[in-house]
Amino acid sequence: MKLVVADSGPLIALASSGHLDVLLAIVDELVIPETVFQECTANMGKPGASDIRDAVVAGRIKKVADPIVGVFGSIEDLDAGEALALSLATIVQSPILIDDAIGREVARAHNIGVIGGCGILLLAKKQGLISKVEPILQSWKDGLGYRLSDSLVAQVLMKAGERK
């Protein structure tokens, strides 16, 4: 994938589970607005925060100034990072890495391509970057408290060939 704008949720999940490098191997350029960076690194004691900061410092993730939020700022159910990431994706005409259900719905309504953390894992497995998806999803649910429905997990595992 060429250029992708990321929201904090899947970025934190991938970094916290030790898979930020997998994401960076899949995308040619990962861009985040300043607010998303702040959300990811507000508590440097949390897993993944230092990995995200280090990737930005090393230039592996490009941090840009927050764009004008535009139409996305008026959508009540979006947090600031989601609204700004959606705005940036519109400006640079790229897909967005986002897991929030409302954020994904808004992106699709505005013809923004969407990929989520699970989609990144499926691509990673297909490209041979990881051998199994299930333990990563389990670590997101158990270790991070990441909200993944049982039906979504089952669907992803079926696509990954890890469950029938």
Question: Residues of each region from the PLM?
Answer:
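Active-site-proximal, substrate-binding regions of enzyme catalytic domains
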Residues: 2-94, 101, 109-112, 135, ...
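Mid-chain, well-packed structural core segment of small domains
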Residues: 100-105, 109-117, 126, 130
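Hydrophobic alpha-helical interaction segments
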Residues: 118-160
